Amino acid sequence: MNNARPIRRALLSVSDKTGILEFAQALHAQGVELLSTGGTARLLADNGVPVIEVSDYTGHPEIMDGRVKTLHPKVHGGILARRGIDELVMEQNNINPIDLVAVNLYPFAETVAKEGCTLADAVENIDIGGPTMVRSTAKNHKDTTIIVNASDYGRVIAEMQANEGSTTLETRFDLAIAAFEHTAAYDGMIANYFGTKVPAHSKDECHEDSKFPRTYNTQLVKKQDLRYGENSHQTAAFYVDTNLDEASVATAVQLQGKALSYNNIADTDSALECVKEFDEPACVIVKHANPCGVAIGDNLLEAYNRAFQTDPTSAFGGIIAFNGELDAATAAAIVERQFVEVIIAPSVSQAARDVVAAKANVRLLECGQWASKTTSLDYKRVNGGLLLQDRDQGMVGIDDVKVVSKRQPTASEMKDLMFCWKVAKFVKSNAIVYAKNSMTIGVGAGQMSRVYSAKVAGIKAADEGLVVQDSVMASDAFFPFRDGIDAAAEAGISCIIQPGGSIRDEEIINAADEHGMAMVFTGMRHFRH
């Protein structure tokens, strides 16, 4: 059975007019009758493309300042009519078939993103006729063609030219999926916006804003299927948020290597987000979602060498992230020294690509340079629900911390404290990080007891022959007891940065003073689970 459907009549009504004139001209060249509305119709007419206004076609004018334009039986009957079934009804009601609809919707997201947008502004940018036509056409995809993305104009014209003015069922079905995805995302945005409006306490206002809507709607697009999930018995896929354009593992382009695994993607995200914290040339090496080596240097090669030195054992099979262009010398140092799963950087020089190409299995990613960080939400799934929170973008500078000990940190200690605090933010709690000269000396991650995380950091440093004496220490949360301070002093730590806030803060500070250590409070915690 031939599933091709000829395009003889099309309705074009778009807010974003990118490419619509050229598309209309191509349809006209194929002998297609064009219907249109408002600004789209004027654009076509002004450029010599024959077009029939929908109001003339239906015999009913646009009313209510354009709120009612296409909501008419001649429009929706023409779209929804089943070919070979509804011809008699169409004839009785003077309805002609409409074979193609190209629609994109009022810019609701752009409107509500504007500073000073009112509820009234938002309401006027809720499209009614557009989504209705989109859904009608997509529902009847067996016979009609829907286009919601300008990027599909050329595809449809090419298919018509190759098929005597017709489209195939395969194409119509694919476009219908895109259409339903489009309207689902649109309605989700509207529901999210309205869901943040809660009854106001003021008599003069009907609502005030809440950060979290009553229902949360989001749409993620599948980027790739994965070989398996966290474990080989789990199936998995990678979905991305196309509304966020910050350089990330989601936007990264893979230049070479084996396909990314579930764990590769998760660990690469951890490494990249950590290295973004640094302005100086920096390298972060991650293993099982925890930084095992972090350092800054005069250049990326020095930063990598120092980061690797922290824990060469754990770096084996790790993920390496940089905050600058990967050069040939740094790439050579990596592939000649260690087995690595993934290397990611904002950009990769051609010489570096050539070096890494010798190791065909190494996954090399280029993510683009980040100018700023996007304000967004973090998700954590629990059985039967989803936890939403602000992304942890909190960070402190030298002017934000409070020295609580008798001894003041030296300038070099304070610099190391700032470095160490940035790293601790990305270590699984309980997190303890030892550092010296802008290089991690030991990392204690994920222990149920904070004092044991401190002990682990010391053990890691000792195993690699690194000297803890006169290093600084960061703790992602406050110390509940002085035992962590005593353990740090015994290891040779000279200075500690921590949030503070324990009911035993005075005892903790006294312990630091007893050991002649400097201690600063950040007033900010960085739990990471």
Swiss-Prot record:
Pathway: Purine metabolism; IMP biosynthesis via de novo pathway; 5-formamido-1-(5-phospho-D-ribosyl)imidazole-4-carboxamide from 5-amino-1-(5-phospho-D-ribosyl)imidazole-4-carboxamide (10-formyl THF route): step 1/1; Purine metabolism; IMP biosynthesis via de novo pathway; IMP from 5-formamido-1-(5-phospho-D-ribosyl)imidazole-4-carboxamide: step 1/1. GO terms for molecular function: IMP cyclohydrolase activity; phosphoribosylaminoimidazolecarboxamide formyltransferase activity. Pfam families: AICARFT_IMPCHas, MGS. Belongs to the PurH family. It comes from Shewanella piezotolerans (strain WP3 / JCM 13877). It catalyses: (6R)-10-formyltetrahydrofolate + 5-amino-1-(5-phospho-beta-D-ribosyl)imidazole-4-carboxamide = 5-formamido-1-(5-phospho-D-ribosyl)imidazole-4-carboxamide + (6S)-5,6,7,8-tetrahydrofolate; IMP + H2O = 5-formamido-1-(5-phospho-D-ribosyl)imidazole-4-carboxamide. This is Bifunctional purine biosynthesis protein PurH. The keyword Phosphoprotein does not apply. InterPro entries: AICAR_Tfase_dup_dom_sf, Cytidine_deaminase-like, MGS-like_dom, MGS-like_dom_sf, PurH-like. GO terms for cellular component: cytosol. Its EC number is 2.1.2.3, 3.5.4.10. One of its GO terms (biological process) is 'de novo' IMP biosynthetic process. Residues 1-148 form the MGS-like domain. The IMP cyclohydrolase activity resides in the N-terminal region. Keywords: Hydrolase, Multifunctional enzyme, Purine biosynthesis, Transferase.
